[in-house]
């Protein structure tokens, strides 16, 4: 049998006055759960992140939002699920299900998908429900002609858009679940990952996450799946939802045949470490998260052996080019300004001529022929005009 529905005063007392103590948590559905559970009650599971899975529903139940729990689950978890159900919907459907696993004994199903939870995460559940409803409404608008043939479409689980998961109730639940005094006595909460609920710093962070701004949402991405799940995959595809103040459901990957269900193919959702703790709703007027810090500039690369070898090769080629240019220039200059043999210093073997020998050799040389003037002489040459006249005779 489902846990009794809590009153709105109980939510207020749990969130603000802390009057919902461990005695009230343990009392209630314990006797009924023990009667229906074939074995002993399960202990509190490790606090892991929720995950989204596909579920097969009948055509008559395709529009229902159902809260499932295992009869052997801890009574505190059942009361958590009941508080969440009556905070999100006016007339919720709480149903026991023996196919649930011990690590995630709480499941929230809506429009063909299921959100499996180890502990109740109000922010996750509220955001997931509103996201599923928006996508379902967009799908109805796309198939309005087909739906008009079979009559009016079934109504939403709650009348009106603002009556599904009221913001104040969800925020009160998130605050109540984060309180230390609200936990059952004699139970030590175990967690997986870097979170440590037993430390005071982690508890303060969870309270701050319940009242502070939530991280931005990321769109669901689905890889390739089997042909049987193509129809369910198409129902999930669509434009990302509108602005919402609850944390988003992270990336979902299809894993067919995973354990933990009799008629559903399980999919694991990879969640960052800091988004698993329960949080509350935040008004849209609050400031958005700070933008990402700019990436640091790349450091300049140092010299490598290849760059050093290339530099040395370039220097060697430059030196050879300059040397070749100078050699060619010197050769040209030598050819242009080369002189003949000296009239004073003849080529001798020992190169030790004296001044007297040089003068004697110069005097013994035949006389050079006198150059004739190109001008025409005014008078004819006479017989005593000199050697030229004699030579002419």
Swiss-Prot record:
Cysteine disulfide partners in this protein: none
Region (Disordered): 184-306, 366-393
Compositionally biased tracts (Basic residues): 366-377
Biased composition (Polar residues): 188-201, 262-275
A GO biological-process term: response to xenobiotic stimulus
Cytoplasmic side: 331-393
Residue numbers on the Extracellular membrane side: 28-309
UniProt signal peptide: 1-27
Location in or out of the cell: Cell membrane; Cytoplasm
Any Gene Ontology CC annotation: plasma membrane
Membrane topology term: Single-pass type I membrane protein
Transmembrane parts of this sequence: 310-330
Induction: Up-regulated by genotoxic stresses of adriamycin and/or UV irradiation in a p53/TP53-dependent manner.
Tissue expression per record: Expressed in heart, placenta, skeletal muscle, testis, brain and lung.
Compositionally biased region (Low complexity): 289-305
Assigned keywords, A-Z: Cell membrane, Cytoplasm, Membrane, Signal, Transmembrane, Transmembrane helix
Domain of life of the source: Eukaryota
Described function: May act as a tumor suppressor. Inhibits tumor cell growth, when overexpressed.
Protein name from the UniProt record: Tumor protein p53-inducible protein 13
